[in-house]
């Protein structure tokens, strides 16, 4: 099978295997898809139609980290946003959400990932934003980050859903940030 045919077959198998699972709310078609090489827009449209044929009862969604036509194919769109962690401040999320909603009021907006790293060994009195790529990840910044992001999200009824990244710290061999190499330390629980 070609890459695209294989992807379609996997989507069919996924939906047929899990269509009756009580925790399935929607079918996700991509996460942080980068437009390198062939333009994926037509393929994502085909997957969207296929998902609807297999299960007309659930919406489709996608998780994006960029602008572009990809964001207008699925029923819902969610963005992976780390405002206040990878540069900027938590308030940047408010600006992003408000501008996106103003420009596209018909689109249902979600936040598919948001989070900040922390170490139980890193404590500080001041509220100073750390460098995400640095070794110092104080817990009080992670707490502030989540409190500020939640306020921003809760004040916007047009946001259909949010997903914290992540419940637990987890292994990620390529990570060299925080006080433990090979760990993504964005977990709410260490």
What are these language model-derived features?
Residues 1-190:
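Extended substrate-binding grooves/exosites of carbohydrate-active enzymes
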